[in-house]
């Protein structure tokens, strides 16, 4: 929704959510998503199709207000090949950002299956507006040529995270196999002991209850086990 402050979506299993996974609308402050697992979300097609991550400045009818200091970190997203609603390939999903100030996108895994596609449509791309670090993408990821995707070199494109059971329907399927490149490859989120400073305090535990340190590199994704 819009006009929210310090709303945190964490430790959720989101599965077959028609509209998609992350949605942050306008006039939001210190809101975000961390330590969630998204499986086959965003099957809605048409004018308001589903998205993987959606940041918007929509704040009501005929009202646009940018959001500030929001975050998306340590989530695991699995996109299947086929949309079982219409039996077409899952090729409509986007990471779609409109105007917002300071959105922090760290340590997420996005797995795009064989026939699916993910488009990066970052319309406010600059270091002031967004910080993309230590994210891992695998599969057909297309960058919209009209809006260049500026990101830290730590972002890993075309890297298989090696899930325990890719395509499964349970959270345990998205733990990491031994030898996964996602182990100890994340960005350290620290800088504050205030648990309500979600951008500089990582909350201390992952989706599965494993400890997340403030001084050693975490895993990429929602699983911080070993």
Set out the residue ranges of the language-model regions.
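Residues in well-ordered beta-strands of folded domains
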Residues: 23, 164, 177, 221-223
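Short amphipathic alpha-helical segments
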Residues: 158, 177-178
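Surface beta-loop-beta hairpin patches that serve as ligand-binding interfaces in beta-rich domains
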Residues: 171-173, 180-226
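Glycine- and acidic/polar-rich repeat regions and solenoidal domains
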Residues: 1-172
């Amino acid at each position: 929704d819009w006009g929210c402050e310090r709303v945190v979506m964490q430790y959720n299993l989101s599965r077959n959510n028609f509209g998609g996974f992350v949605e942050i609308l306008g006039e939001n402050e210190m809101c975000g998503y961390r330590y969630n697992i998204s499986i086959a979300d965003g099957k809605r097609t048409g004018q308001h199709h589903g998205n993987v991550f959606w940041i918007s400045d929509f704040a009501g009818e005929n009202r646009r207000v940018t959001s500030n200091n929001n975050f998306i970190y340590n989530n695991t997203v699995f996109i299947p090949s086929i949309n079982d609603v219409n039996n077409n390939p899952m090729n409509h999903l986007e990471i779609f950002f409109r105007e917002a100030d300071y959105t922090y996108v760290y340590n997420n895994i996005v797995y795009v299956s064989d026939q699916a596609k993910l488009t990066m449509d970052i319309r406010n791309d600059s270091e002031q507006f967004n910080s993309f670090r230590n994210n891992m993408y695998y599969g057909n990821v297309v960058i919209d040529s009209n809006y260049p995707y500026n990101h830290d070199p730590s972002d890993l494109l075309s890297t298989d995270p090696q899930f325990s059971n890719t395509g499964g329907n349970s959270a345990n399927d998205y733990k990491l196999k031994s030898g996964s490149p996602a182990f100890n490859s994340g960005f350290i989120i620290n800088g504050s002991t205030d648990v309500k400073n979600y951008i500089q305090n990582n909350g201390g535990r992952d989706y599965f209850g494993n400890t997340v340190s403030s001084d050693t590199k975490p895993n990429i994704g929602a699983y911080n086990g070993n």
